[in-house]
């Protein structure tokens, strides 16, 4: 059966029953239909003094066209922990509309390790992304309105940095001219659109602790500069209060369920390159108060998502992972070993061994954070015993252990062995987590630390303009902020075609951006796309309603 057929065949429980497994009463759930609900802010506040459960991060090797199955493993591990008698909850991100109608498929997991209701989660869900788009757009409108009515703040209209957003892949909107059509429409200027998940509002929603913190962070956003290059903040436009009103419901995490009726929080969805690529702090911290084990994931490979989880999310939220699960597949090892995608079905132990260097690099990087690492081999039907053993032997040589997991095929039955070992490690107290760099380290040195320790680069190339900008931000009081690297997810270098574990390369910094509200400095390496385009044949062409009123073609 396909993923959607498996999801539709599942027996869903009313969301009130799912909430009850975590101790959330019906009065503290704000239902959206029968199978999804938001958890009230008052309930979240009421559990803040409880002790935390164990935090498990699921990450992966650099993504390949063969697919690694990170979300599938996250869901499968959560179900597996519940199967062996642990009270566990899954925390993942929401899906963006744009990619769902572009490249084929949304989905949250796959096979027998999915979160449902699948269609809702990949379409409008509970309206969080619409609220974020609306709040962002309100600020855009208020900036141009301020300029129209006299520009008291003396905004330099050539230096308005706040772009507009829409939750769609639309390359035609990347660079536009706004306010054409005469005096009544304002002052013409260059502008552009990003996709909603690239918005700083999204990053802020996912890092804010509560509504008060949200409003403070929104006010801190830099939206433009004056002629003297001094910043204009969102609070100068007086937009943060109304934006908070638009976001008050979106701040409440969404509760749904897995195919095996276990609880899952699905909340927030920032880009893993331009932002930090993790689900919301409020969902993760709430889950930790309600469950003994919380399984969460971070976007793309461990060099991007896990690094940001450790250095941004954990630092901001005071979190510390008890175990990291690194997802790898035999197919991906073969691809890293030089096998073409069409030939991945044939046994090739030598290619598996050759392709393990990328896996080894990630293991070493993660161990550098002081956290125990378990490799989950996400099983595919074409994997042979010899190939699986080759991965296990390699991982053992790296001071870690690899466990085969068959959750896609068998659900929690297939992930029970992985869950048992992860639980043992998490409960052992072996984790000695520490971030990669201290707050007090200068910004450029933080960038160099990530480049050398995580990417194994020889040097960072940054011109005087960038170095001076970083020094200026330090003088303005932003030197304590963590770094958010924006680079290709496909390689440790900035060349997406450079597979494996390259060393000795340089990391060129093209641009630096201050996300003062979110609280990090974005370092752009190479080309970064904040508004994707649709492919030649977008998946939207194949999406329709069938005669039964069911969605077809979405996954």
Swiss-Prot record:
PROSITE patterns: FTHFS_1 (PS00721), FTHFS_2 (PS00722)
Catalytic activity from the UniProt record: (6S)-5,6,7,8-tetrahydrofolate + formate + ATP = (6R)-10-formyltetrahydrofolate + ADP + phosphate
Family to which the UniProt record says this protein belongs: Belongs to the formate--tetrahydrofolate ligase family.
Alphabetical list of NCBIfam families matching this protein: PRK13505.1 (NF010030)
Keyword Transmembrane helix: no
SUPFAM superfamilies assigned: P-loop containing nucleoside triphosphate hydrolases
A Pfam family assignment: FTHFS
Domain of life: Bacteria
Protein name: Formate--tetrahydrofolate ligase
Metabolic or biological pathway: One-carbon metabolism; tetrahydrofolate interconversion
The entry's keywords: ATP-binding, Ligase, Nucleotide-binding, One-carbon metabolism
GO BP: tetrahydrofolate interconversion
Gene name in the database record: fhs
Annotated positions binding ATP: 64-71
Parts forming coiled coils: none
One MF annotation (Gene Ontology) recorded for this entry: formate-tetrahydrofolate ligase activity
Enzyme nomenclature, EC number: 6.3.4.3
The protein's enzyme class: ligase
